[in-house]
Amino acid sequence: PVVPAAHYQCGGIVVDLDGKSSINNLYAAGECSCTGLHGGNRLASNSLLEALVYSHRAAADVIKRVGAIEFNTNVPEWDSEGTVQPNELVLITSNLRELQNVMSNYVGIVRSDQRLKRAMDRLRIIYGETEGLYERTIVSPRLCELRNLITVAYLIVKSAQARKESVGLHYSTDYPPVEKLIS
């Protein structure tokens, strides 16, 4: 069946005009960054130009500063003592599907306080189960990706819960669009 799908995110890592974040030596450009150029919505073709401009500006800034950056090469080897091979990969797959369903059903195009609360409740359960897997199994890319997706989902829901108006693509049935508040 044809269903809505998230193919980009509005928001992300807040950066300055050179793509610098608030974390020293961390730059962001493209879909992961929040430049402020889009306002309350994202125009379809603008993201490509934004990515090109900000990646160019970030690269130019890094080139100027690269000689002064200190790199820590003393990183300890991974210690997997006390962990086991994951015998239950189906748990990772199941949690990923559940996460996708929660975000699609409750944090999609139309939102409400009730849906967001339900999403947060489910996210806490998925988080707890996933952290249990992380603590006792050898780390895998799939498990790390799931943990990252849960973190992003949590941040999206938390931010949506803090918003008390409907602006651009941030629409809630509980709050009128800003245009109606102004008129």
Regions picked out by a protein language model, each given a short descriptive name:
Residues 2-5:
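Short Gly/Pro-enriched turn/cap motifs at secondary-structure boundaries
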